[in-house]
Amino acid sequence: FGQQKLLELAMALMNEPKMLLLDEPTAGINPTLINGIIDRLIKVNSEYGITLLVIEHNMRVIMSLAQKIFCLAHGKMLAEGSPDQIKNDKRVVDAYLGAQ
C-alpha cells in the first residue's frame, strides 16, 4: 500500500503544482514505510518549493513534517504553532497525547 501512495504522489507531481492537499498520506501504511513517505514529502517541499497542506491524525508524522501546525478538536481551532509549540501546549497534550 505504501508503494501505491508513492505512485499517487508522483502522479500528483506530474502537473507541477504549487500546492498539494494531502489527506492522511500515511494512513494504512506499514510503520517502516512511513519514514520514506515523510522524507519524500520533505524533499517535495524543500527542493521543488511545493506547499504541502496535510491533514493527519498521526502526531509523529505531522511533528516530523510540518513547520506550522493547526490543531483542531471537535471541529474548532485548538492551537496553532510550530511543532515545539504544539507539543508543549497543554490543550493539545490533553486532547491528543493524553493528560500528563
Q: What are the residue ranges of the model-derived segments?
A:
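Hydrophobic anchor residue at the start of the ABC signature
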Residues: 1, 9
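Conserved catalytic motifs of ABC-family nucleotide-binding domains
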Residues: 16
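Catalytic Walker B motif of ABC-type/P-loop ATPase nucleotide-binding domains
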Residues: 20-24
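Helical segment within the ABC ATPase nucleotide-binding domain
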Residues: 35-47
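H-loop/switch region of ABC-family ATPase nucleotide-binding domains
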Residues: 56-57
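A short, surface-exposed alpha-helical micro-motif characterized by mixed small hydrophobic
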Residues: 62-64
